[in-house]
Every structure is written in C-alpha cells, then in structure tokens.
Amino acid sequence: MPQPPRVAVLHIRTSRPHAPAFQAELDMLNDATLAALAAEGWDAELVAVTERPADEVRRLARAADVVLVMGGEDVDPALYDGLTEYPGSGMHEPEADRITFEVMCEAVAERRPLLGICRGLQQLNVALGGTLHEHMTGHVVKADDPFVATTVRAEADTDIARLGASAPVRCSHHQAIRDVGDGLRVTARASDGTIEAIEHIDAPVAAVQWHPEYPAVAREQLAPLVRALLARA
C-alpha cells in the first residue's frame, strides 16, 4: 500500500508577543491547513523556520513530498533593493527569508513540489530575482476581518485553472509582485491587474497570493493545488 504524501508546512514562528492578534490569525490558517491535508490522508508537519536549526529545516523540506510555505511578515526589502520605509512596514524576518529562499531554490533546481501562499508567493518571486510593490493602495480591509473576498482570473492550461477560469478567493495582503522572477510565469490576476498566482515554467513549483487554506474553502482550494504539483513531479 503506497505511503501518504508527506507535507512540510513552513511558517515563521509559533509566538508573537508583540502581535498576538496576528499570531492568532496565522495559527487559524495553519490549523486549517493541517485539517485540510489530514482530510486527504496526507501526513503534514508544521515547521517553524525561526525556531529550528537551518540544517533541520532544509532536511525536513528535502524529506517531504511537497513543501508549503505559509504567510507572515513582509519580505525583507533589502533582498530586492526595495524601500526600507513604506506604509504598513513593520517587523521583517531576514533569517527566515534566507533559509526559505534556499529551500525554494533547491526545490526549483531538483524539481521538488513546493507551493507558496501569500508571503510564500512574494518570497518565491524575490528568491528567483523578482521585485515587489512595497505597498498597494486601494486594498480595503475591514477592521473585524482582514480577509477580502475577491475574484481571480486564471490563465488557461495552468494548475490554477483547475480551480476554475474565474475563482472566488480570500486575500489579505498589502504587497504584490512588481517584476516577475526568473523562470516564473503569471498564472492568475485580480480584476485590477494585480498578479495573484505564479508558477515555474519547468519545476513543480507554484505560489498564490490569496489564501486557499482559509477555513471556509481549504478543502476545495488547497488540496487541488497540492495534488496538481504532486502530479507534475
């Protein structure tokens, strides 16, 4: 009997005393991710990148059948020659970025499945030489709900298109891709042209700006994306 896929779910940290509400939001998404993967019979493990030795993070990523890179703080702007001060800027995690970039570049080089979500999309783009808009204007977020319902349109013949040519999603971000990284192609956009998904042209590596792990849609949106990457491996 075949073994279930092993999934390494990379996130930043398990505690943010300076931002408890943000930590609770990320914990909710991590819990929904684990529940959606467990419902598929997959074996998933949360890996806090800042709380484990870098060698251990890399080892766990290599041992997994697929890696998920979750959301969190903004990517360190020094990594793409971005502005150090901008609206909404806050704490950065340069060491987490460095380790995750290594995992991502290795996944591309060795054609191992990897899915980036929100910050994970931005990290993948920067890891491969792309840049970001430091702050997007006009993205309105309600105080009682940081997730905005929107619709993205997928490019034909892409993994994202398997969710439907036009899919309703939940977003929560104030940054977005400016210049697309090497070897990546755009696979979905929002109605205002914002890049909402990318995939590598050769490796089973992709990323989405929205949150397919949002509890209300995780079973319907997260698992199909992971399955598509496993099928490409």
Regions found by a protein language model. Give the residues of each.
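Active-site glycine-centered loops adjacent to acidic/histidine catalytic or metal-binding residues
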Residues: C118, H173, H211
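Short beta-strand segments that buttress and anchor functional surface loops
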Residues: V186-R189
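Active-site-proximal beta-strand elements of phosphoester/diester hydrolases
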Residues: A206-W210
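Short catalytic/ligand-gating loop segments at beta-alpha or beta-beta junctions
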Residues: V169-H174, I198
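N-terminal beta1-alpha1 cap of cysteine-dependent amidohydrolase-like domains
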Residues: M1-R112, V126, H133, T137-V148, ...
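Gly/Ala-rich beta-loop-alpha elbow adjacent to hydrolase catalytic centers
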Residues: G116, G120, N125, G129
